[in-house]
A protein has these predicted regions:
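Periplasmic-binding protein-like
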Residues: 167-170, 229-234, 238-241, 245, ...
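Boundary at the C-terminal end of the N-terminal hydrophobic targeting segment
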Residues: 19-25
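Bacterial N-terminal signal peptides
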Residues: 8-18
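Short, polar/charged alpha-helical segment
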Residues: 29-39, 52-63, 73-94, 172
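A ligand-binding cleft/hinge motif common to bilobed small-molecule-binding domains
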Residues: 129-133, 257-276
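Extracytoplasmic ligand-binding site segments that recognize negatively charged/polar headgroups
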Residues: 69-84, 96-112, 118-255
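Mature extracytoplasmic/periplasmic domains
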Residues: 286, 290-355
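Extracellular/periplasmic bilobal clamshell ligand-binding domains
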Residues: 334-383
Length: 383
């Protein structure tokens, strides 16, 4: 009888242990859906609990703060979908999201801060303004986030004041009805030396800092000047007023054979709609980082920490990819399945733009040369 009681008790303990384990590992419904939709190995989420293990004081503080104000570039619908697991995990934090353009995310917030007004708690994609925030010592140190060490040191600020939450490739979109794969340039020099891309077949947008600046930094100013002159003088590209996304749409419509630069996630969206769009990266592959940062004077510091830490966790990274094809920066997720058009990116030499170039003499020289061509009727004559 005693043996039977012991067996029953042992079995009950085992069942309770299993239930407890299942409860601890249970994922938000939106996360489960994302893993299923992307056909991912659930083991990729191993370690998530440790990444989200924040101090109790942060949780208690966030409950008192009740909200966090976030500025970014996502469409409101995308942001709502992307952050569903966060809201399930932290229902006591209201996410107030404000979609803003470059100036809104950058200088407007900084000017307001200098006037004693705090407009947001968390900002994303502030590359063009990050140096000004650094000079003003306006950003909080994020080293204390459990997720800080998830990210390669190449993708975080040396002083810990920002972390990358995604990578962006700045390559070429092309029309697959008009361009064959074998005609695509292997290097950037191949592009400007191939007449097939001349006579208006290439559309340029006025965003040289997104792709060309990193190449100037990689190869030097002598190469950069020669390449820039060849780009305009040899190819005579269409100089378009549209933004990156709209120009990619014009490629799909057949307005020109290719556009430069084009974000990989925009091209991927057109492909999923059945448009005749491909994506190609000459070597080296230009990469820009999208930062996420917290204002040091944030009135919702604990809620802001929770949000940023979640964004760079395995779960946050996978949800960004599932929602808008964002490429993860998490060390454990550097896998081809997370890279749109992996066949033209994975295995190639890459060049991550050093954002210090944005306030460098190199950028000044590149911009002056670029603008001299961009604003001229037919481009300046060679010196």
């Amino acid at each position: 009888m005693l043996r039977r009681i012991l067996l029953i008790a042992t079995g009950l303990v085992s069942v309770l242990a299993l239930l407890s384990s299942a409860g601890a590992a249970e994922l938000p419904k939106a996360t489960q859906k994302a893993v299923a939709d992307l056909k991912l190995d659930p083991a990729l989420l191993n370690g998530l609990d440790a990444e989200l293990d924040v101090p109790k004081a942060w949780l208690d503080g966030a409950r008192q703060e009740k909200e966090v104000i976030i500025s970014g570039t996502w469409e409101p619908r995308e942001f709502q979908q992307m952050t569903a697991p966060f809201r399930e995990r932290y229902p006591f934090v209201n996410l107030r999201y404000e979609r803003a353009g470059t100036s809104g995310r950058g200088m407007q917030v900084l000017v307001a801060l200098q006037e004693g007004r705090v407009l947001v708690d968390v900002m994303t994609s502030i590359a063009d303004a990050v140096s000004y925030y650094t000079q003003a010592k306006a950003l909080a140190d994020l080293h204390d986030l459990p997720g800080f060490n998830n990210i390669s040191k190449d993708y975080v600020a040396a002083d810990g004041t920002w972390i990358s939450h995604k990578l962006s490739f700045r390559c070429m979109a092309y029309n697959t009805d008009k361009v064959k794969k074998e005609a695509l340039p292997k290097t950037w020099d191949d592009l400007v030396n191939d007449p097939r891309w001349g006579n208006g077949n290439l559309g340029l947008t006025n965003n040289p800092s997104a792709w060309l600046l990193g190449l100037w930094g990689e190869f030097g100013e002598t190469w950069g000047e020669k390449f820039t002159r060849s780009l305009f003088e040899k190819l005579q590209p269409q100089r378009r007023k549209e933004g990156l996304s709209a120009a990619t749409g014009l490629v799909a419509a057949g307005e020109f054979n290719g556009s430069l630069p084009s974000p990989e996630w925009v091209a991927k969206r057109y492909v999923t709609k059945g448009a005749p769009v491909g994506y190609h990266c000459p070597e080296p592959v230009p990469i820009t980082l999208s930062q996420i940062a917290m204002l040091d004077k944030s009135p919702h510091r604990n809620a802001a920490r929770l949000f940023i830490n979640w964004m760079v966790s395995r779960e946050g990274q996978i949800l960004q990819n599932a929602t808008s094809f964002d490429v993860p920066v998490h060390k454990a997720l550097q896998l081809p399945e997370f890279v749109p058009f992996a066949d033209t990116i994975v295995g190639k030499r890459k060049k991550v733009r050093d954002d210090a170039l944005l306030v460098s003499d190199t950028n000044k020289k590149m911009t002056e040369l670029w603008d001299s061509y961009w604003t001229a009727a037919a481009g300046p004559k060679k010196p």
